[in-house]
Structure formats: C-alpha cells, structure tokens
Amino acid sequence: MVRYNRDKFVGEKYEVLVVTEADVELSSVICVSIGRGRHKQVIAEHRHLVEQGARLVEMRLDYIRRNVTLQRLLKDRPSPVVMTCRRQQDGGKWEGTEENRIILLRAAIVAGVDYIDLE
C-alpha cells in the first residue's frame, strides 16, 4: 500500500510512504467503486453505500463528464475515499492528457483524499 504524506512536501513532490504488511494489522475491506457522470450522483451513491455498510469507496474521476470539483466530492464524506482516474488504455474513460490526469490526482492529494489508486 502506498500513501502520500500530506504533511511532508519535498520540493514539488509529496513524500511517498510505502506501508508493508508488517506495518499494519491485516484485515479485509471491500472497496466499492462509484462511476457516475455527475457530482451529485457520486455524492448520493456514496452516502447510500455507507448506509448499506460500505467502509471504503472508490470515486472514478474519469466517469465525471464535466470539470471535477474535488472539494465538492470530498466535503462531508461519510467514509474514507480512494480516487482514481483511469486512462482508456487501462479500461477507463479519461480523454484528457496524461499531464492533466496527474495534475488532477495531485490536486486530490492536496484536497485531502484518503487514498489514490494508480495504474
């Protein structure tokens, strides 16, 4: 598992923390993926999934049709969130440039997302 340490910014990059099995208590958590075209649909489904018992959700940023507003997606979130933005070559819907995809994911880190998933 890889986590970014938001508290330690080195140059233009965040320090990357690599967590091994020896560092954490092993347990299983199912992460439910949300791929919807509108922010309000993602937010509503996130709330619904948590009400049904989900403990972790993945928000697929590549499904959102308009400009992604990270603060809106992360505000008052009812559970930890994994954000990802899949390229088409990885089975996703991202049509922008690779540079813009990385900028979006870095912005998610700055906005306080719990986890980032990269292919």
Which positions does each model-derived feature cover?
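N-terminal-biased segments
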Residues: V2-V10, V50-V68
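N-terminal amphipathic alpha-helix/helix-capping segment at the start of soluble metabolic enzymes
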Residues: V2-A44
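Acidic (Asp/Glu)-rich catalytic clusters
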Residues: E21-V24, H46-E51, N67-V81, R106-A111
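Catalytic beta/alpha-barrel core
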Residues: S33-G35, L56-I64, L105, A111-E119
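A common structural microfeature
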Residues: V29, A54-E58, P80-V82
